[in-house]
Regions:
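Post-signal-peptide N-terminal segment of Sec-exported extracytoplasmic proteins
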Residues: 26, 35-77, 129-140
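C-terminal motif of bacterial Sec signal peptides marking the signal peptidase cleavage site
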Residues: 15-18
Length: 159
């Protein structure tokens, strides 16, 4: 009988613990340049895609990083914004950056090749986000490499 006095309360406690909400896994986002547009003043407008790879929505607020084009000196990326991105979904932000003269020349050389041209880039940094089940935001590191190519019929646009 004394064993039952221990087993019943222990089973009730375990049942209550099991009733809590399941913890959703959180993973770093993927950040890529979806489009680069050369503006009339020589600035570049980047359309940056943030892909939430987590099982819960995340509130993104800051992007800090750098972008390196064709092994040239990297340029700083910084943006403050508000985006609530659902689980396994993505959204875009716009960033205006001022490229170096060498970056501009490299991009012009790629544009001159037309659809045969492509430009390697590397992006890295951190994105600040608050996962759905957490009380405070935290920084998630990201890094990636990809290529940009001229878009036929859209001068000054690369994807």
């Amino acid at each position: 009988m004394s064993v039952l006095r221990w087993i019943v309360p222990a089973l009730l406690c375990l049942a209550l613990v099991a009733c809590g909400p399941p913890k959703k896994s959180v993973f770093p986002p993927t950040v890529t340049v979806q489009q680069l547009t050369v503006l009339p003043g020589g600035q570049w407008q980047l359309t940056v895609r943030i892909q939430n790879n987590s099982y819960s929505s995340m509130d993104f607020s800051v992007l800090e990083g750098s972008m390196q084009v064709a092994e040239l000196m990297p340029i700083r990326l910084h943006a403050s914004f508000t985006r609530d991105i659902p689980a396994f979904a993505g959204d875009v932000i716009q960033l205006d950056v001022l490229p170096t003269a060498a970056m501009t020349q490299t991009l012009q050389a790629v544009a001159a090749k037309g659809s045969r041209g492509s430009l390697a880039y590397r992006i890295g940094g951190s994105a600040r986000a608050q996962p759905e089940q957490e009380d405070t935001p935290r920084d998630f590191d990201f890094s990636g490499r990809d290529w940009l190519s001229p878009v036929p019929g859209m001068p000054g646009t690369f994807r």
